Amino acid sequence: MKVDIFESSGASRVHSIPFYLQRISAGFPSPAQGYEKQELNLHEYCVRHPSATYFLRVSGSSMEDGRIHDGDVLVVDRSLTASHGSIVVACIHNEFTVKRLLLRPRPCLMPMNKDFPVYYIDPDNESVEIWGVVTHSLIEHPVCLR
């Protein structure tokens, strides 16, 4: 998997943008609901530990069923401890990959696409390093301009 790594930049270029507290309907809208506005700073929302956070751009389709697609940007926090079920960035034989970490019944890195094999972790003869826990994914949706 090819990855592009971006470090978390300082807050000097970060701007707060309007954030409406009312949840938006994905069904039929209610015109009677009012909308309360606050400010949302995406850097503060996505980056809990700036010195331990980096961004990766996904390349490949092994995590599509986990809603992580080719081209998405992942927010990865190295200060968090991965646990059973965490989405992690791992380094295997000097190659980076993003997978779901399963610790039981047998430790493995599980792709979220049935077309890809499970990578079983054998602690006796193999070095797998967890580089961080994925906390957010940023998806760019196509925009149709007229």
Curated annotation (Swiss-Prot):
GO terms (BP aspect): DNA repair; proteolysis; regulation of DNA-templated transcription; SOS response
What Pfam families does the annotation carry?
Peptidase_S24 (PF00717)
Coiled-coil ranges from the UniProt annotation: none
**The EC number(s) this enzyme carries:** 3.4.21.-
Q: Name one GO molecular function term.
A: DNA binding
Its keywords, alphabetically, are: Autocatalytic cleavage, DNA damage, DNA repair, Hydrolase, Plasmid, Protease, Serine protease, SOS mutagenesis, SOS response
Residues at the site labelled Cleavage: A26, G27
Active-site residues, as the UniProt record annotates them: S62 (for autocatalytic cleavage activity), K99 (for autocatalytic cleavage activity)
InterPro entries from the UniProt entry: LexA-like, LexA/Signal_pep-like_sf, LexA_repressor, Peptidase_S24_LexA, Peptidase_S24_S26A/B/C
Q: Note whether Hydrolase occurs among the keywords.
A: yes
Q: Does the keyword Hydrolase apply?
A: yes
State the function annotated in the UniProt record. Involved in UV protection and mutation.
General remark: The mucAB operon is the plasmid-borne analog of the E.coli umuDC operon.
What family, per the record?
A: Belongs to the peptidase S24 family.
Which protein are we looking at?
Protein MucA
The primary gene name is mucA
